Amino acid sequence: MELHPGRPADWIADGSVDEVTPTLAQELLARSADRVSAQNTALWLSSGDHLDPILGSGPHADEFVGDFRQPLDRGIISMVYASGQPVCENAIASNPQHSPLLDQRLGIQTDAMVAVPLVVMGEIAGIITCVHTRPADSSEPPKEFHAADLDEFEFAAACLGRLFEASLLRED
């Protein structure tokens, strides 16, 4: 099978996936975040030369979902998209691959990130992320992720991939 025609970022808006799929995807991300004691998740889908956050949860989701574009030549999530390799990274600020674009826009700092490729029909369609953040001027200690947290989001990505496949293959 080949990836569905069109850009993955357009699948929801253009009706390529049914109306239930985004709701189920949102619920799956929220449940996985709860299992790893985190608040912030996002589903980023490919849109040419950038990744678009299509769904998200957490206190800042409404401020960037549908209104931000992550260039594919910057950031850890772009590296995950290009390589197809998941990442569980703590001390994000010290990683030169980290793109501060979204942090600066939201007035936060990202402390830790889990980023996993979303594979649909054998091809990478996007990334799911879970992050620990705090206010940019915070003195509270940073939170971290662990290997089991990466496992949780790899499972979520596999489920989401199958969910999108089933929705894209449905007969109208």
PLM regions and their residue ranges:
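GAF sensory/regulatory domain recognition
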Residues: A30, A42-V65, S94, T133
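Flexible loop/coil segments at beta-strand boundaries within sensory signal-transduction domains
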Residues: V119-I124, T133, S167
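Amphipathic alpha-helical "output/dimerization" segments
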Residues: S139-E165
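Acidic/proline- and glycine-rich, intrinsically disordered low-complexity segments
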Residues: E63-V87
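A short, aliphatic-rich beta-strand micro-motif
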Residues: D111-V120
